[in-house]
Structures are given as C-alpha cells and as structure tokens.
Amino acid sequence: MTTSELIRKLCKEQNITIAELARRIGQTRQNLYKKLQRETLSIEEMKQIADALGVVFEQSFTLPDGNKYTIRNEGMTNEDNR
C-alpha cells in the first residue's frame, strides 16, 4: 500500500474528504491531490496529516546493533531491540 493509498483509506474510515483534509492542514484541495498523486508529501506534511486525522505518524532508524529509534509526530523514542 502506498502512502497516498493509506491516507485515502484513513480519510474514508473517518468520513473525511481530501478537500477537508487539505483545509485542515492549510493546503488547497488541488495541491494536496497533486502531492498524493505524485507521492511527494514532505515529512512535515505527513505529521500535519497525522495530526489532522488523529493518528500517530512514525518513522524508524534501526542501527546495526538492533537498537531502534522511532520518530513520532509527538517526539522520539528509543527501543532497544537487543
């Protein structure tokens, strides 16, 4: 599933249109549609979308030793996977 497919799925589950999501994050509907179509959302936009949808956005860095750092829209955590 692509990022844009997931965003559309979350919107559908919450009965939120892409136009409404765009309004919530301060973008035009046309601009958000283009970014979803091209898969060109920035990390900051992903955080804004997560906040607007009431979900957590996170990314992870896993070090060679198994130590994992997860960045969420509310901060960073360290998960020791050893």
Predicted regions and their residues:
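DNA major-groove recognition helix of helix-turn-helix/homeodomain DNA-binding modules
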Residues: E44-E58
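Alpha-helical residues within the helix-turn-helix
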Residues: K12, R23, D51
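Short, charged recognition helix plus adjacent turn
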Residues: S60-R82
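Recognition helix of helix-turn-helix/homeodomain-like DNA-binding domains
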Residues: G26-L41
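A short, Lys/Arg-rich alpha-helix, primarily the initiator
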Residues: M1-Q14, E20
